[in-house]
From Swiss-Prot:
Topological type in the membrane: Single-pass membrane protein
Gene that encodes the chain: cdh
Species assigned in the record: Escherichia coli O8 (strain IAI1)
EC number(s) given by UniProt: 3.6.1.26
Similarity comment: family membership: Belongs to the Cdh family.
Identification of the protein by name: CDP-diacylglycerol pyrophosphatase
Length: 251
């Protein structure tokens, strides 16, 4: 019993330390790198010279930019043209805020252009990390390939995913996830952030503790995946963990 208690205490200490390290990372100047690129480079260059560089696309009227990430051959980031830190922002549950997940899904075409041929929808995934699961303090959705093992697991659970948020059998990558099936028409009309905040008990008060991902299914529906920070299981809610930036699924 004493050994079990000691092990439990050690796990708590490790979890707290890990959380502290994550927070420390977010307080340095490097955590503002993406925001500076968007607000000080991409946006001014587009407005003054009609050139989105270093971004791949800048849409001031629609409120977003698309940037090629340095990590991985096909990974892109979709980011707002104004200040939003991350999933904890109340702006994400405001109906007037752009539907960033839907916009990010449209931006998947940049992957195909970079690849030189169409990237199948089944190979694409979108993900945003929680407040403690990210390294940047500017809202960004990762547009990248899905891990083959995650793709296989979601395919096997296709019939088990409903239009309500329910635990995904077995979780993903050793962490618990909620899964919800949505149609394309539903996704166009309503942001996944609003679905999470309005449909999962107490989620609205703790949005910053959630990571959120989206994947297309073989029946042309989408599955939303939400994981919540849990220090006892060392889950920082980094939904990006379902992605493979080296795109093994395309080989």
């Amino acid at each position: 019993m004493k050994k079990a208690g000691l092990l439990f205490l050690v796990m708590i200490v490790i979890a707290v330390v890990a959380s502290g390290i994550g927070y420390w990372k977010l307080t340095g100047e490097e955590s503002d790198t993406l925001r500076k690129i968007v607000l000080e480079e991409c946006l001014p260059n587009q407005q003054q010279n009609q050139n989105p560089s270093p971004c791949a696309e800048v849409k001031p009227n629609a409120g977003y930019v698309v940037l090629k990430d340095l990590n991985g051959p096909l990974q892109y980031l979709l980011m707002p043209t104004y200040r939003i830190n991350g999933t904890e922002s109340p702006l994400l549950t405001d109906p007037s805020t752009p539907n960033f997940f839907w916009l990010a899904w449209q931006a998947r075409d940049f992957m195909s252009k970079k690849y030189g041929q169409p990237v199948p929808d089944r190979a694409v995934s979108l993900a945003i990390n929680s407040r403690t699961g990210r390294t940047q303090n500017h809202f960004h959705i990762h547009i990248s390939c899905i891990r083959p093992d995650v793709r296989e697991q979601l395919d096997k659970n296709l019939a088990n995913i409903s239009s309500r948020w329910l635990p995904l059998p077995g979780g993903l990558r050793g962490h618990e996830y909620l899964a919800r099936r949505v149609t394309e028409s539903e996704l166009v009309q309503r942001s996944p952030f609003m679905m999470l905040a309005e449909e999962v008990p107490e989620a609205r008060e703790h949005m910053g503790s959630y990571g959120l991902a989206m994947v297309r299914q073989s029946d042309n529906s989408f599955v939303l995946l939400a994981t919540q920070r849990n220090l006892l299981t060392l889950n920082r809610a980094s939904a990006e963990e379902i992605q493979d930036h080296e795109c093994e699924i395309l080989r």
